[in-house]
Amino acid sequence: MPAASAPILYESHCHTPLCKHAVGEPEEYCEHALRRGLRGIIFTCHAPLPHGWSADVRMTDAQFPEYVAMVERARAAYAGRLDVRLGLESDYAPGLEPWLEALHRRVPLHHVLGSVHYQVRFYRERYFTGDVFAYQQTYYEHLAQAAESGLFDTLSHPDLVKNESPAEWHFPRIRPYVERALDRIAATGVAMELNTSGRLKSLAEMNPGAAQLALMAERGIPVVIGADAHRPDRVGDGYATALRMLQEAGYREVNVFLDRRRHPVPIERALASLA
């Protein structure tokens, strides 16, 4: 076991009540980050989208300044104790690129997650035909397109679609499509997330699972870990398990984004830093 070291990791994926399905004020999330032995926290609440795109699970465009102010309030309150940063989780689907490009330029952001949320109504209405396997293929095609768009730092929970119908998730069958998508993603340099909240979903394992993570490692795709916290007590949850899973897949480093620049951290050092 490595000797304890100073805090170095960040919670790189967490939310605020503005998304309508998270609870707790930013300051409460910050308190849990300190208890977990984290150096900082990057709020990445669900970004507003045009035309009422799944408005029930995200802030409105009019609330965006309020979101920025909430994070700034927490940053000021924890100055000198915890590094609090502003980010976003932005949904990707073809056609949203112009909106997202303009949104991401409004304020300085530190980490921009790109997500394909197969379960939201607007996405399902456009892409689900009733064929689950075809939907899985579409999901990976859109992940690759998200990376190629240049809009995102990290692709979040990048096998989320397996929860659409766990009984119809057979990785050997989808693997050729996954590999083609990962080849395209690797060519962009965009990172991918190991999301610990997958353990709480219908198919209870990390997002992605071990098989996909190994394919990512083979291609040298950088990884960021995040808990996808929608309540304060989930900040930093499962980080030690995630780091060991990365090691088992062949990774030696984990990454943090600050100022939208990727900073690698040795996994052994990261493990030693956790409370």
Task: Give the positions of each predicted feature.
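An N-terminally biased module of ancient metal coordination in phosphate/nucleic-acid-related enzymes
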Residues: 1-90, 94, 164-173, 231-237, ...
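Charged catalytic cores and adjacent phosphate/nucleic-acid-binding surfaces used
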Residues: 1-16, 26, 169-275
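Structural preference for beta-strand elements that scaffold enzyme active sites
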Residues: 7-11, 40-42, 81-87, 110-113, ...
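Short, acidic/polar
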Residues: 22-32, 95-103, 138-145, 178
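Active-site gating/metal-coordination segments in enzymes
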Residues: 73-129, 133-134
